[in-house]
Amino acid sequence: MVVHNPNNWHWIDKNCLPWSKDYFRDNVLETEFENDEYKIVLTSVDSVSGDCDVTQRKGKVLCIYDMKLQFSLSVDLKAEEDEDKNSFKASISVPEFVHDQEEDEYVFEISADDKKAEIRKYFVPVLKLKLMKFQNDLIESHAKDVQHAT
C-alpha cells in the first residue's frame, strides 16, 4: 500500500500487531539452548498482546510498540536418571516489550517449579538476541507501506 501524502505532512500509521504475532511464531518459536546439562526449547508462543505500529511523519519511518509476550518452554535435564524428573514445562513472559527499550532493560518473568536460575542464565540471553532483531525487521518489512509516493 503506497499512500498519497504530499510533503509527508500527515501521520500515516499501520497496525502491525497481526504481523508481529506471525513474526514471533516464525522467528522465536523453537528457540533453543543446549549444553551438557540442559536442553531448553521455546515450544509455543502463547500470547502477543498490546500495540505495534509503523508510522511515518515528515518522511521519517518510525515504529512504536508496547507489547506483552508470553512463551512456553520445555526443559530437559540430561543428567537426571528418573524419567519423571528429567523434563518439565516452564513459561517465560516479557511484560513490557517496547520500542525504546535498551538491551539491559528487558524484564523476563520465569514461571517454573525448578531451575529458574538456569533458565535465566542460559536461555534468556539466547531469547534476548532474537527479540532485539524485532525492531529492525519490523521497520524493514513495513516502511514501504507508510511512505508516500513520489
Model-derived regions: residue spans:
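Long protein-protein interaction modules used by eukaryotic assembly/scaffold proteins
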Residues: 1-23, 27, 31-150
